[in-house]
């Protein structure tokens, strides 16, 4: 979708991150810091100031990384956050769109709802969807993905 709209794509590869981070604040912070460092090494080569618009698209712990990188580097960016973890809201700002499933074991829906309300962020909640935005019903999941991509495209187009 982003490429179709003329965005240049810079994919960030995190490398190896700690395992079994869910429920372990120390490991989660370690994973975040490592992912942020990997991102910094790759993204610092980009001259963001030459672009009319910067769009970060992220998922899971990557939502915290994208928000923190943009904030730390004073990049005026728009953000698409797919299934943020609870810790992401420590750095997520007021510019973006959020997608969350009510069966996501990484963060309670009420937390996501409250944090999005505080920031006036559009939030799209999918009932019974997990951290991968899947419900276990393939046909339903395809429809869910189609809806998510429609909302994503609408956000990209609303410059």
What are these regions (language model features)?
Residues 73-86, 94-95:
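A conserved short beta-strand
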Residues 1-50:
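Serine-hydrolase catalytic machinery in alpha/beta-hydrolase-like enzymes
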Residues 54-67:
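Gly/Ala-rich beta-loop-alpha elbow adjacent to hydrolase catalytic centers
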Residues 14-15, 80-88, 101-103:
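Active-site nucleophile loop of the alpha/beta-hydrolase fold
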Residues 22, 129-144:
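Catalytic histidine-centered segment of alpha/beta-hydrolase-like enzymes
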Residues 98-100, 104, 112:
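Short beta-strand/loop motif that positions the catalytic acidic residue
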Residues 102-107, 131-132:
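Acidic catalytic loop of the alpha/beta-hydrolase fold
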Residues 36-43, 137-159:
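Catalytic active-site module of serine/aspartate enzymes centered on a nucleophile-bearing elbow/loop
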